[in-house]
Amino acid sequence: MPLKAAKDSIDLGIFVSDIKKSLAFYQGILGLEKTEELVTGFGTLHRLKFGTSDIKLMDPKQVPPVGAIGLEKQLGIRYVTFVIKGLTELCTELKGKGVEFTIPETQIRPGTRIAMVKDPDGNILEFVERG
């Protein structure tokens, strides 16, 4: 039986090493809105909104070791994509705030531009603007 979507997006959980740095990045720099803070058995979940998607930052009771960082360093989910408007302006702002780019603003095909950056733990975020 195929999955039946209850909403038009998926949510993502990211375990972080320093919740203050991560919230400063995702809320303060990217402007995501925090909608919930929930204590769980293994840490505190901080729910942030991007459109209809939830980005769930988990502040674990015990911080696990960091795995390999980079697009081609290990199998599994390697980056998160945000489809946005205003890529050039965002890139200018991120550069001004010292955010590390793994791929600067680049046209990957006519009408589609991307940029990739690292969050405070080295997780890679892709920003895409189409049209």
Regions found by a protein language model. Give the residues of each.
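Vicinal oxygen chelate
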Residues: 1-10, 33-81, 92-118, 130-131
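Conserved beta-strand-loop-alpha-helix junction that forms the acyl-donor binding cleft
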Residues: 16-19
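Short, conserved charged micro-motifs
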Residues: 21, 87-90
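Conserved active-site tyrosine of GNAT-family acetyltransferases
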Residues: 22-27, 94, 122
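Short glycine-/small-residue motifs
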Residues: 124-127
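Conserved hydrophobic beta-strand within the GNAT/NAT acetyltransferase core sheet
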Residues: 12-14
